[in-house]
Each structure stands twice: as structure tokens, then as C-alpha cells.
From Swiss-Prot:
SMART domains: ZnF_C2H2. This is Gastrula zinc finger protein XlCGF49.1. Belongs to the krueppel C2H2-type zinc-finger protein family. It is found in: Nucleus. May be involved in transcriptional regulation. It comes from the Eukaryota. A zinc finger (C2H2-type) spans 6-28, 34-56, 62-84, 90-112, 118-140. GO terms for molecular function: DNA-binding transcription factor activity, RNA polymerase II-specific; RNA polymerase II cis-regulatory region sequence-specific DNA binding; zinc ion binding.
């Protein structure tokens, strides 16, 4: 129970099924075979594309019982609810700033490392966030 024998050689993340490892590995190779027919954005995983489609349909079935705000994904609601509880379990080891989400801490950490792993294929400008690159590329 809970055994994950398939490990990614790039980042050491483990999976219970070989097919999940193969799907995950596309993140590292940059392969993005799934394209949104609405906006042209590409994805490495089919599940991510299907999740992305909710942005276009406006589907938001998960509502916050505290304030009524609705979300397209249950995990987004769970993260939002930390606003009401004030929970910030993730702390930066460099400066002590705390975050409600691990992903926000990872983004913040790039301030300290000055890491900018996302670069524009058109002009070469680099970004610390993929979302900033995405919006920048729309300007070309």
C-alpha cells in the first residue's frame, strides 16, 4: 500500500505506476502534445488540458462556505480557505516569510536565487514565472 517504485531520474519524484512516470517526464523534456482548441496553449498532460478547459467554460462547481467565492477546482477552494483560517504552514528558510501554499513559497524562493528558468523563444527575455512568460509571449 502506497508503494511508489517508479522514480524520475530528473527530480526524484516517485510514482506507483510506470505510465504516471512517463507522463510526468514530459515536464522535463518540454514535450507538450496536448493543445487547447480555444486559445492554442499547449500542455504536457491531457489532465492539465482538461482542467484548463474550465477556464474557457467558466465552470466553477466548488464554493467557499465562508464567503461564497467559487472555484473550478477543489484544490483551489482548499487553498482559498486558508485565507479565512490564516494558515501559512510554509516558511522561507532564507527570510522567514510564510505562505499558505507550497507553490507560492517556491515562487518566492526565486527572489533569493534570482532564478529565471523561463525564456521567450522570440526575444530571449527570461522570467522567474511561467505565467509571466505566457503573458509576455502574447505581446509578440
Amino acid at each position: 500500500l502506497g508503494e511508489k517504485p517508479f522514480t524520475c531520474m530528473e527530480c526524484s519524484k516517485s510514482f506507483s505506476q510506470k505510465s504516471n512516470l512517463q507522463t510526468h517526464y514530459k515536464i522535463h523534456t518540454g514535450e507538450k502534445p496536448f493543445t487547447c482548441m480555444e486559445c492554442g496553449r499547449t500542455f504536457s498532460q491531457k489532465s492539465t488540458l482538461l482542467s484548463h478547459y474550465k477556464m474557457h467554460t467558466g465552470e466553477r462547481p466548488f464554493s467557499c462556505s465562508e464567503c461564497g467565492k467559487s472555484f473550478s477546482h477543489k484544490n483551489k477552494l482548499t487553498l482559498h480557505q486558508k485565507i479565512h483560517t490564516g494558515e501559512k504552514p510554509y516558511a522561507c528558510t532564507e527570510c522567514g516569510k510564510r505562505f499558505p501554499e507550497k507553490s507560492k513559497l517556491k515562487i518566492h524562493w526565486k527572489i533569493h536565487t534570482r532564478e529565471k528558468p523561463f525564456s521567450c523563444t522570440e526575444c530571449g527575455k527570461k522570467f522567474s514565472r511561467e505565467s509571466n512568460l505566457y503573458f509576455h509571449q502574447k505581446m509578440h
